[in-house]
């Protein structure tokens, strides 16, 4: 099934767009050692709703971004900063 999330970078900002309303979502970014470097919660109530996450102060390396909602939905992605 299609995942209702897309993510793009513009400079040092990661833009996450939800392509369908999914309710309350917890967002976490973890570094390569599983340390949580970012957390946020938001209520996604509209098509195309976005969040902008600055990664300006992150070290170079690989990160995992995780999304969880109250209906036991879970999806993750990986990105690398140079």
Place the predicted regions along the sequence by residue.
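C-terminal tail/sorting-segment detector
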Residues: 64-82
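Short, glycine-anchored, charge-dense loop/turn motifs used at functional sites
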Residues: 31-35, 63
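Short proline/glycine-enriched turn/loop motifs at strand-loop junctions of beta-rich domains
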Residues: 20-24, 58
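Short edge beta-strand/loop segments characteristic of extracellular beta-sandwich folds
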Residues: 10-19
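Solvent-exposed serine/threonine-rich low-complexity stretches and specific carbohydrate-binding patches
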Residues: 37-45
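Transition segment at domain starts
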Residues: 1-9
């Amino acid at each position: 099934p299609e995942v209702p999330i897309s993510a793009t970078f513009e400079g040092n900002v990661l833009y996450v767009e939800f392509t369908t309303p999914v309710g309350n979502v917890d967002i976490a970014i973890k570094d390569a050692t599983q340390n949580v470097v970012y957390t946020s919660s938001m209520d996604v109530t509209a098509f195309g709703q976005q969040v902008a996450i600055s990664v300006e102060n992150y070290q170079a390396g690989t990160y995992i971004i995780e999304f969880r909602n109250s209906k036991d939905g879970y999806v993750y992605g990986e990105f690398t900063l140079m």
